[in-house]
Every structure is written in C-alpha cells, then in structure tokens.
C-alpha cells in the first residue's frame, strides 16, 4: 500500500502487479514564461491549465473520477491540455500560482483561442464529471464554440 511506496491514496496498491491506467495527455508547464510561449502558439485552440500536486487529494480525485470520464475525454480532445505540477512549491511554482491568484491546487484556468483567460470559467476544488461537463460547457460558450451536452 502507501507504506510500500504507493503514491495514490485511492489506489495504494497501484503498480503492484497491475498495469497502470492511461493518464490524460497533459503537457507540463514549468514556468510563467513557458506558459506564455505555449499560449502564443496554441493555434486558436481553447487551452486548459490544470494546477496539480502529488500531495493534493482533490487533484487525485479529479484525475481518477473526473478526467477519466469518457464524456470529459471527448471534450478534452478539442482542447490543448496543460498541467502545472506545483508539488515542489519552488519559486517558479509560486510565481505561476501568484499570477492567477491561486493559493494552491486544485485549480483550473481556461484560455480562449486568443490566448486570454476566459472570465468566469475557473474551476477551484474537486468537481464530479457531471459538474465538470457543465463547467466545460460554460468554457465552450465563452470561447464561442458549440455547447456541450452534460447527459449522454
């Protein structure tokens, strides 16, 4: 379990003989400057920036229960997914958090095709897949894209 080196409190024996599950394909962002470079070259896509840390239980819940939902995955295919891993809480991590006035993870910031943050679309704390689909619908509406249906 966790005492044997498992890092996920929801799956303390993960990796102990079972294949690892597929993870959401986030591009890691390590600094504010790197984020600006990526946003400038995002080719008109909506961008999602997920603030994550290994010690953040709600972050693990988002990965396990929300991001893994096929309906969420379908919406992710239409976005550029970025992740700022602030586990180390170093100067670059703190600068990124401060830039978006976040105290820590979990926090998700969305940017429109123009590279600017989409006002009123931040997700702070855990959201179930159902609630997150509603949040993604708001993001798409603000970005001028077709609305997302929450129900299958």
What are these regions (language model features)?
Residues 1-80, 84-152:
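Proteins that catalyze or organize thiol-disulfide redox chemistry
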């Amino acid at each position: 379990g966790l005492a044997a080196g498992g890092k996920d409190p929801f799956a303390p024996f993960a990796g102990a003989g079972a294949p690892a599950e597929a993870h959401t394909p986030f591009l890691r962002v390590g600094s504010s400057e790197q984020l600006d470079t990526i946003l400038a070259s995002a080719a008109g896509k909506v961008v999602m920036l997920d603030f994550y840390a290994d010690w953040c239980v709600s972050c693990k819940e988002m990965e396990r229960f929300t991001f893994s939902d096929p309906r969420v995955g379908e919406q992710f295919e239409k976005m550029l997914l970025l992740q700022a891993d602030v586990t180390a809480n170093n100067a670059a991590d703190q600068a990124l958090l401060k830039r978006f006035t976040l105290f820590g993870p979990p926090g998700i910031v969305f940017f429109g095709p123009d590279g600017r943050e989409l006002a009123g679309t931040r997700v702070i704390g855990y959201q179930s897949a159902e609630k997150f689909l509603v949040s993604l619908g708001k993001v798409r509406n603000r970005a001028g894209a077709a609305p997302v249906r929450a129900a299958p």
